[in-house]
């Protein structure tokens, strides 16, 4: 029995690379889509916000001397490429994915329209939100917090390459332990970088919990949906 009826899944662009140094690894994206298909079959309504860091990172571009707003718009276009790849992989897995973009690109995808997104979720379609918030200076984590709040998601599932939030970097500190649950305030006081500050504050204000888990760990997404001990739950 699923623990959640409607979720917002945040996928980082980097997660789509698999073991590659750049771009989209087809086997990796197919594995993610198969995981999503499993929870859709359980009757869970799934919306996805996807990053673009495997193609272009606005923050990195800005740091290299590029105008930050221009770099961020380029990053938004990178998320569009990822969203279309995800939608295509879903089609091959017999899931109906619908891409809605915060930037208008009418020949390619639908614009973001909240009531339409909610209706599509209720119809069992997976809605993929592309182009972040549509505004520069906001990350795709913030887009996940925003869209999750707008569609009435019960939780934001932050899919990463690490299986939760740790007391320290587990790659550097072998004694680091994983938090099973932690409050927003505790995460802030311990300076744990769960999401960027804007996204984190929005989730906290909206009382929207965050689950951090590993998307590369087989079966982890399904275990999260079933309410099993997987990843770290950040709560009010």
Curated annotation (Swiss-Prot):
Question: Pathway, per Swiss-Prot/TrEMBL?
Answer: Pyrimidine metabolism; CTP biosynthesis via de novo pathway; UDP from UMP (UMPK route): step 1/1
| GO process terms (BP) | 'de novo' CTP biosynthetic process; UDP biosynthetic process
**Which Gene3D superfamilies does this chain map to?**
Acetylglutamate kinase-like (3.40.1160.10)
Taxonomic superkingdom: Bacteria
Query: Activity regulation here?
Result: Inhibited by UTP.
Q: Which reaction does this chain catalyze? A: UMP + ATP = UDP + ADP
Molecular function via GO: ATP binding; UMP kinase activity
The reply on keyword ATP-binding is yes
Q: Note one Pfam family from the annotation.
A: AA_kinase
Q: Where in the cell is it found?
A: Cytoplasm
Q: What is its main location?
A: cytoplasm
The keyword Cytoplasm belongs to this UniProt entry's keyword annotation:
yes
Residues recorded as binding ATP, renumbered to this chain, are 10-13, 53, 57, 160, 166, 169
* EC number of this enzyme: 2.7.4.22
**What keywords sit in the KW lines?**
ATP-binding, Cytoplasm, Kinase, Nucleotide-binding, Pyrimidine biosynthesis, Transferase
Q: Can you tell me which residues bind UMP?
A: 52, 72, 133-140
Q: What class of enzyme is it?
A: transferase
Assembly notes: Homohexamer.
Matches recorded under NCBIfam families: pyrH_bact
> What HAMAP family is this protein classified in?
PyrH_B
Which family would the database say this protein is a member of? Belongs to the UMP kinase family.
Stored PANTHER family:
URIDYLATE KINASE, URIDYLATE KINASE PUMPKIN, CHLOROPLASTIC
Q: What is this protein called?
A: Uridylate kinase
